[in-house]
Amino acid sequence: IKFDGLSRVSHVTDATDWRVEFPLVVLTPDSEAEMAALVKGCIELGLTIIPRGGGTGYTGGAIPLDWQSAVINTEKLIDIGRVEPRRLPGLDRDVPTIWTEAGVVTQRVADAAEDAGLVFAVDPTSAEASCIGGNIAMNAGGKKAVLWGTALDNLASWRMVTPNAEWLEVTRINHNLGKIHDAEVASFELVY
C-alpha cells in the first residue's frame, strides 16, 4: 500500500500522457489471493478502483479522474502456465490454452505459444511491456487480429473480483474458436 509521491506520480498517466489527477493510493498486491480484500477495502472507503498493468494503453483506461481513486497495479501477478490442450465447454475436441495472471507481459505468452509451435493471436506493438490483463480489458489486437481475432475473441475464461469482493469465474460456452462477432450468440457460464 503506497501513499508516497513517487508511486502516485508514476501512476497518474498511461501511454497517452493525459494527466487529470493523482490517485490517493497505489496498491501492489503480491498475489492474486490479496485482490478480493483490496477491492473490498477500496469499496468500503468509496474509492474508484483503477486496475493497471504495464501502463501502455492509449485509451486512458488507467488514468485517475479524481483524487479519490486507488490504482491496483497488477505487475507482480506474473504466474504463467504452459500451453496445454484443454476441452472447452461445448466443444468436442481439445484446443491449446494457456493460463496466466493479469500482470504477465504479453511477450511471455507469445514466446510460450511459439515454443509450443503455435501463434499467440494478440500482438500489440507494446507486447514487450503490456500485460495480459490490460490486453483483455482493452480488447487488444495487433496485426494478427485480422486473421485470428482480438483478445476477447481468443479468451476462454477469466476470473475477476466483483464489487461485492467475491471471486467470479466467467467461462465462454460453445466457443467458436474465431472472432466473437462471427458467432450468432456468445454464451458464458458464471460461477461464484
How should each PLM-predicted stretch be described?
Residues 44-46, 176:
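Acidic/proline-rich low-complexity IDRs
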Residues 79-90, 96-192:
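FAD-binding subdomain of flavoenzyme oxidoreductases
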Residues 46-48, 72:
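Glycine-rich active-site/cofactor-binding loop and its immediate structural neighborhood
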Residues 1-40, 57-97, 125:
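N-terminal flexible segment immediately upstream of the FAD-binding catalytic core
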Residues 50-51, 121:
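Short hydrophobic alpha-helical runs that function as membrane-insertion/retention elements
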